[in-house]
Structures are given as structure tokens and as C-alpha cells.
């Protein structure tokens, strides 16, 4: 029985909760409703929770109130994506409720879960039921009820998990799109993983780190990040050496402990990955030949690589001497845009953006990433264009905590961001800019072409894995195996008689032949529409479109 939770135990709950979420991040990602290739809910919740965990591990306290402040700060600054921001708000309210306590009992634990729910609902402009919010709410209500009957925090947490799981299983009945696709809510699943980790800690158990399975065809990849902090002659082991050995029947029997011990004599930075049939080795050594000779005792050498790190270091020094790092530009009004692709970044810069944050579908910048840019710019005012619906909440959170006066333009796509930035007037007030830039977002129709990562049926469209998908805003309107067919079906949905301008932003994976045929088709079918084509270089999306 656990009747009290202090800072030490709460820290372990956080650590185990974060680990369990990390172990299940891929599973949570797989529950994403839309088959768009993004690193969405699981990835973002994991990165957010990991940020909170790291802050806690670096600032341990027996006082649960003090530890809660630390945890909340870590989550707040590390929050990525809407799911990560909501997670940070759930625990922001939780931790606010315990900030004056040195330890808490089951009743206060339940009340804190409820306080977190109230904070999170306030943070979301239009709360949707059948999501992480619903699971958190139902779990908190169950906790309040159970706390009247038990003083045991373990028993309380067990009941919370039962009710959270019931709520999760019910999410398809509350959100039609979940039922159509046949999944439960991904954010709710992520939260349940955290709660399950909490219970493990309360029981004195540990969540073992999940070891990622490494593809046999993937060799050890090593980056040597010198940054000129050492002298070339100080490098003791000069050769980054890698080998892959396929075990042989008539060769020496492989014993990993013995192998590691022997290999460690050759150098440092040793990494050994044993995959039953193959062993993969990475080591920094002065004698690569000895490493290879040793490996041959066990079987056939099938992949070898040697890099001279001293020469790499000299090259880094030469480059750093010729290329000074640019200083962060300081401005009165910072215009900050989230961008994906060098071409798109150049478009934003040419239109007046002062600061570009690299991000987008597969890696949403955190609240802290945005805060740092604002602070380093030393601006008095900031205009933030997230250009992705999943970066909107992190942008708003960043705007709310910086000292500068900051506004967020609710751009949910790159085309919307370009349209909004076109309306920006540096001589106008923030509120004037916010009004006219936000208004421009409503006047542009955004579309995109990408590929599906799994089979599904959504919005009445049958989708096969690896097929192309045409989207208008977030709605899938076309999916075919042929790229040009998908594009033309998408554009037929986007273009109308009164359409005047079509902007095409070409991604890094677009095929020139498809682009040429698409432009010819547009000119034939919509001769009155002016077409503007830009090289965007964005990943994942072959094309972005905007119609005005």
C-alpha cells in the first residue's frame, strides 16, 4: 500500500511513465487516423514527455511541489504538436494543484488529475470529445470517485487505468472518423501508456527500455561532430572502423561478452550489435587491420568501412576558418515562419520573414524552439506563422510565455503561410497585421499531394498503402496508384470558374515528367487560370497547391 507520494516517488512515476510511452510511441503513431506519412501523436507525446523527464532527472527533489514545477516546466518547453501541448497542459494543471505540498495522498492525487483536465480543456479553443481530453476527463472523474473509498494510491491508479482504458475503447463511438478507420484515439492511448508507467513506479517496478530491432542491412552510422574543440594531434584513435561479420559454421563460436572484451582492447567508442547470424561493430582504433583480422575468426567479413578522423577533423577546421557562423538577426519586429524545404524557406525570406524555423510534418518544433528564436532575436514584437495545424498550439504556447508582444497567425499550411505573409505590413501594429493576415488565410484554398503509409478508408475514399493521395486542407479527395491521375483529380476539386491564380510548389520527390504533364493539363483545362510554379524542395509532399 502507498498512502503518500513524495517528490522521489513522483520522479520515478514520471520516469517510468516516460519510458512506457517511449516504448509504445510507434504503436501510438500507428493509430493516427490519416494515412499521411507524418511523425505525429506518438512521436510528439514521446518527445514532450522525454523533455519533462530530463528536466526532472536533472533537478530531483523530495518535495513533490518543487518537483512538479520542474516537471511542468520541462513539458511546457518541450511540447511538440497538439498532442504534446495538451499533455503538457494536463500536467501543468496537475502540478499547479500540488505546488504547495511536500507530499500528497490519494485524495489530492485524484484532485490533481481533475485540475489537469480543467487546465487542458481551457487551453484548447474547440475541445473535441473522443480524444485524449475525453480519456483524461473520464479517468479523472473515476479517480475522484475512487478516492472516497481508498487511501491506497496503487489501488487508485489501478482504477484510473481500468476506466481510462474503457474510455479509450469508447472513443470510436464519440468520433466518427475513428470508427470509420477502425482505431481508438492515438492521444488517449499515449496518455494511458503514461498512466501505466505511473502504476509500475507505485508498485516499485521498472519499465524496461525497449531495444529497437536493427535491420541487418543497416550498418552502424556514426557522426563525428568535432566543432574544432580539440586539436588534431589530440585524437588518440584516428580511424573510425566499422565491420559486419557473418558467422561461419567452422569458425570460432561467438560469445558476445568475450567479443566485447577483446574488441575493447583495440580502441574506444565501441558498439557491438549481435543479430544471431551477423555481428556489427563500430570502434575508433589506431589499427583497423587488427580489428578486421580479429573479426575473421568468427566468419566472413561482408561490410567494411574505415574513415580517417584526423583528416576529417582537419577538414572541419579548414571549413570553420572560412565560414563563420551567422549571428541570429536582431530586429524590432520578428516575423517567424515554420518552413520545410530550402526553396520554401527562400520564398519566405524573399517575402520579409526575418527568422525561419525548420520543421513541418515529420518534426514539429517544440515550444522551446520557438521561444529561443524570439528571445535571441531580441525583438519587441513577434509574428509567428506555424504553417501546420500540428504546430499551432506550440506556437500559441510560445507566444504566451515570451516577454515580447507576440501574435500567432493561424496558418495551417505552407500556402496559407505564403498568402498571410504577403499581407504583412511592417509599419502596421501587431493587431492590424493579425487581422489582415488572418483574413487572407480564409481567401486561399490549400491542397497537397503525398503518399499513403497504410491501407484504410476515410472520408469515403478507399486508400491503398503507397498510393498517392490528394488532399484539400485536411480532407482526402483522391487516391490513385498513378500520380498524374491523382493530381488532376485533386485540381479538378480545387479549381472553379472564378479561380484566378494557381500556385504550385514542387517538392523534392516530384518527377519532372509529371510536373510537365500537369502544367500542360492545367493550361488546356483551365486556360484562364494564371499558374505560378516554385521549387519548394519540401520532403514527403510532391506538391503543394494554393488557389485564389
From Swiss-Prot:
Q: List the disulfide bonds.
A: none
Q: Which ranges carry the DhaL domain?
A: 8-200
Coiled-coil spans are none
Q: Spell out the InterPro entries in the cross-references.
A: DegV_domain_contain, DhaL_dom, DhaL_dom_sf, FakA-like_C, FakA-like_M, YloV-like
- Matching SMART domains, A to Z? Dak1_2, Dak2
Q: Share an example GO biological-process annotation for this protein.
A: glycerol metabolic process
Which terms does the record give in the GO molecular function aspect? glycerone kinase activity
State what protein this is by name: Uncharacterized protein MW1109
Q: In which organism is this protein found? A: Staphylococcus aureus (strain MW2)
Amino acid at each position: 500500500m502507498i498512502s503518500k507520494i513524495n517528490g522521489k516517488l513522483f520522479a520515478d512515476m514520471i520516469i517510468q511513465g516516460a519510458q512506457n510511452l517511449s516504448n509504445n510511441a510507434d504503436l501510438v503513431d500507428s493509430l493516427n487516423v490519416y494515412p499521411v506519412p507524418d511523425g505525429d501523436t506518438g512521436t510528439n507525446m514521446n518527445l514532450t514527455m522525454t523533455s519533462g523527464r530530463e528536466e526532472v532527472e536533472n533537478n530531483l527533489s523530495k518535495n513533490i511541489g518543487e518537483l512538479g514545477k520542474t516537471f511542468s516546466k520541462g513539458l511546457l518547453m518541450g511540447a511538440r504538436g497538439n498532442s504534446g501541448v495538451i499533455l503538457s497542459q494536463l500536467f501543468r494543471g496537475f502540478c499547479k494543484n500540488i505546488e504547495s505540498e511536500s507530499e500528497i495522498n490519494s485524495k489530492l492525487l485524484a484532485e490533481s488529475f481533475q485540475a489537469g483536465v480543467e487546465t487542458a480543456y481551457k487551453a484548447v479553443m474547440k475541445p473535441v470529445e473522443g480524444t485524449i481530453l475525453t480519456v483524461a476527463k473520464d479517468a479523472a472523474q473515476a479517480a475522484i470517485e475512487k478516492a472516497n473509498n481508498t487511501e491506497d494510491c496503487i489501488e487508485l491508479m489501478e482504477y484510473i487505468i481500468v476506466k481510462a482504458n474503457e474510455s479509450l475503447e469508447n472513443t470510436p463511438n464519440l468520433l466518427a472518423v475513428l470508427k470509420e478507420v477502425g482505431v481508438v484515439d492515438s492521444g488517449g492511448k499515449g496518455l494511458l501508456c503514461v498512466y501505466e508507467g505511473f502504476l509500475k513506479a507505485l508498485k516499485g517496478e521498472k519499465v524496461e527500455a525497449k531495444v529497437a530491432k536493427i535491420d541487418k542491412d543497416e550498418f552502424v552510422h556514426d557522426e563525428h561532430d568535432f566543432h574544432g574543440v580539440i586539436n588534431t594531434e589530440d585524437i588518440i584513435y584516428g580511424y573510425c572502423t566499422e565491420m559486419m561479420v557473418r558467422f561461419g559454421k567452422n569458425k570460432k563460436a561467438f560469445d558476445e561478452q568475450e567479443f566485447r572484451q577483446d574488441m575493447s582492447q583495440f580502441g574506444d567508442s565501441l558498439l557491438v550489435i549481435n543479430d544471431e547470424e551477423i555481428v556489427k561493430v563500430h570502434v575508433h582504433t589506431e589499427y583497423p587491420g587488427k580489428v578486421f583480422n580479429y573479426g575473421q575468426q568468427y566468419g566472413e567479413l561482408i561490410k567494411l568501412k574505415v574513415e580517417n578522423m584526423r583528416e576529417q577533423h582537419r577538414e572541419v577546421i579548414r571549413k570553420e576558418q572560412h565560414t563563420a557562423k551567422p549571428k541570429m538577426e536582431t530586429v524590432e519586429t520578428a516575423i517567424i515562419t515554420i518552413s520545410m524545404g530550402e526553396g520554401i524557406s527562400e520564398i519566405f525570406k524573399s517575402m520579409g520573414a526575418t527568422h525561419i524555423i525548420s520543421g513541418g510534418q515529420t518534426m514539429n518544433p517544440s515550444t522551446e524552439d520557438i521561444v529561443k528564436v524570439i528571445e535571441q532575436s531580441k525583438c519587441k514584437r513577434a509574428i509567428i506563422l506555424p504553417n501546420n495545424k500540428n504546430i499551432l498550439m506550440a506556437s500559441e504556447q510560445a507566444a504566451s510565455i515570451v516577454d515580447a508582444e507576440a501574435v500567432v497567425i493561424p496558418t495551417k499550411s505552407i500556402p496559407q503561410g505564403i498568402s498571410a505573409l504577403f499581407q504583412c505590413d511592417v509599419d502596421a501594429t501587431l493587431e492590424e497585421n493579425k487581422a489582415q493576415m488572418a483574413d487572407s488565410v480564409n481567401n486561399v484554398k490549400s491542397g497537397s499531394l503525398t503518399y499513403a503509409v497504410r491501407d484504410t478508408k476515410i472520408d469515403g475514399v478507399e486508400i491503398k498503402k503507397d498510393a498517392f493521395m490528394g488532399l484539400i486542407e485536411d480532407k482526402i479527395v483522391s487516391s490513385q496508384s498513378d500520380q498524374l491521375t491523382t493530381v488532376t483529380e485533386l485540381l479538378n476539386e480545387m479549381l472553379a470558374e472564378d479561380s484566378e491564380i494557381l500556385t504550385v510548389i514542387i517538392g523534392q520527390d516530384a518527377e519532372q515528367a509529371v510536373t510537365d504533364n500537369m502544367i500542360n493539363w492545367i493550361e488546356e483545362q483551365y486556360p484562364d487560370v494564371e499558374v505560378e510554379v516554385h521549387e519548394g524542395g519540401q520532403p514527403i509532399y510532391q506538391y503543394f497547391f494554393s488557389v485564389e
